[in-house]
Amino acid sequence: MKRRLLLCLFSVALVAGTLYAQEAAFCHPGLLHSEEDFEAVRARLAAGDEHALEALEALRTAPPVNGDHGHNWGVNEYISRGISGQENYMNAYRNAARAYQCAWLWKITGEEGYGDVAIDVLNAYRIYNKGLAGNTNVSLIPGFIGYQFINAAEIMRDYKKWPEEDFELFKQYMIDVWFTTAQDFLERRHDTVEREQNWYHYHSNWGLGNALFCVSLGVLCDLPDIYNYGMYWLKEGPGNESLCVTALHPDAFGQGLCGYGWGLIPWFHKDERGPLGYLNQMQESGRDQGHAMAALGLLSYAFESAYNQGDNAFCNLTNTLIPGQAGAAMVAGAAEYVAAY
């Protein structure tokens, strides 16, 4: 199965025309945090930095680590979202936060008790979780929860008490159980692509989360094919999660180059407050604040992970079809727009 999967991914990369990561080894840890980031935190703690010590105490006492639950929430055989009376995905996102925060605490303090907790969570899901379930909302699980488990595993990958065999099994579990759901959404979108003859049925956060998951998984598993697959959907793909702007995008109602609902950043407003004179409005902007902020967050998580691999996706997005100089600072212009929300 894995061989067929990678052949499929490689064909997508060829169609896209761009390979964002070559066969060179990935840097580890190299997702949301690099080793240099952890070293900087440890140095501030060692120097007795007041703010760093306060932050450490806040992390130690955070609910996912201690609080009312000094143990894992229930690990479900099938993580479910979207069907009333059957939802249990809340357990997964709480446990993902627990694993991630405990991984952080182990990494900056060296205290193995935290490392043991993080590994216990990751192993429990690898052993007991068999799949993701629900209605169409199942497609939100990889991008809003799965990447957090991956970041925890990326931090813990060199933990001496996590056997190499268990780490390899965890990576395969993420491919077999989680990646298949992410891939299915990106390529079929619950059959809306075929039924509606376009890629725009879902708001951008759906695709952003699944692409973020793929970028993260590719780094964790040292698989450039999966990393490139995720970056393709963000930088060249046809969906609302994509930064790609082409002449094929419709100009709906005269509202900018793309119009509402087509592309991650459809509008570019001349404004001196923005980088190079533009504030860039995202596709989720105009909805509630949670959705609007999540769009920038998910994109930033993916691009920060890419940045830590030497792929500066923040700055290599110039597109001649975008008005003025806005295309040279697409993400920065969007960040300034969202910050004014």
Language-model regions, residue ranges each:
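Bacterial N-terminal signal peptides that target proteins for export
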Residues: M1-C8
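Basic/polar N-terminal segments that are highly enriched at the extreme N-terminus
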Residues: M1, T18-A24
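Short, contiguous, pocket-lining structural segments
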Residues: I141, F170, N198-G209, G218-D222, ...
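Bacterial N-terminal signal peptides
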Residues: C8-G17
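Extracellular glycan-targeting catalytic surfaces
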Residues: Q22-E196, Y200, L208, L212, ...
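Long, repeat-rich segments with strong aromatic
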Residues: V219-Y341
